[in-house]
Structures are given as C-alpha cells and as structure tokens.
Amino acid sequence: MLASGLPRVKAEPNDLGARLDCLLGAWLSTGPLASGVPMGASHGIGYVLGAEFGVPHGHTSCIMLPAVMRWNKPANEHRQALISTAMLQSGSDAGDTLDRLIGGLGMPRSLSAVKIGREHFQRIAVQAMATPWVPRNPRPIESPDQLREILELAR
C-alpha cells in the first residue's frame, strides 16, 4: 500500500484514495512493531545518526535501510523476495526496489546527502554496536568492521 500510495500522494497531494492507502499502510506496519518484531542494523545505525549528527529518523531509514537490506541479503534472501513482490517488483532486488521508491519521493539516499563522510564511520560503527538493535540483525554483526561495510554501501 505504501509502495503505491506514497508516489501517488507525491504526484497528487489531494488524491484521497492515495492518502487512504498511505494511512492504512502506515497503520498496518505498526502491528509487527507493537508485537515485538525486532529491528536490526538500520535502526541501530539510524539511532547514532540521529543522536550524534541530528539526522531526522525518517531520513536515517531512507538512507540506511536499502544498504542494510543489501548487506543482509545472504541471510534472508527469501524474505526479501517477498518484500519485492509486495512492492509489485517481483524478481527485483528488494534493496534496489526500496532505493528507487525513496529516490522517487525525493528523500535522501546516501550518507553524503546528509553530509556524513567516511571520517565518521568508525565512531558511528562503535556506537551502533552498543545499541539494542544491532545484535538482532538477521545477519549477525560481530564487529564494527561489519557495520563500516554497511556504511560504505550507504555512502
């Protein structure tokens, strides 16, 4: 619902059907979060980007989620295929599909877009390792080096 509704609202802000799709999509997305579905590296890194660099939460998700999905793909390729299908892009890479959606909405898609360079990656990685979300990532993250790999994907 969000994958189709958000671009329609961007193109035509007064489209009430598109707005309803976005409302319902947002509401449905809260169910898994409320029932305890764990968040992973995207939220762990995003927490640091917000706390240390003032990047808004919505922007951190737009920047980090496609990169984290690409990094996680070896661990959850089947689940990512379901995401691509739900976004009406069956057979496409889920990280790429999400990145195209984000780009089409005019949201930031890279760390450089929010003025965060490589010189900060080590500090971000070390701090993100201490969050409660990184240990719950679908593909285990055992060191800041692995988080720096993800940050490079988002550069």
Residue ranges and their predicted role:
Residues 1-97:
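Active-site segments that bind and position negatively charged phosphate/pyrophosphate groups
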Residues 89-155:
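C-terminal charged capping/lid subdomain of soluble metabolic enzymes
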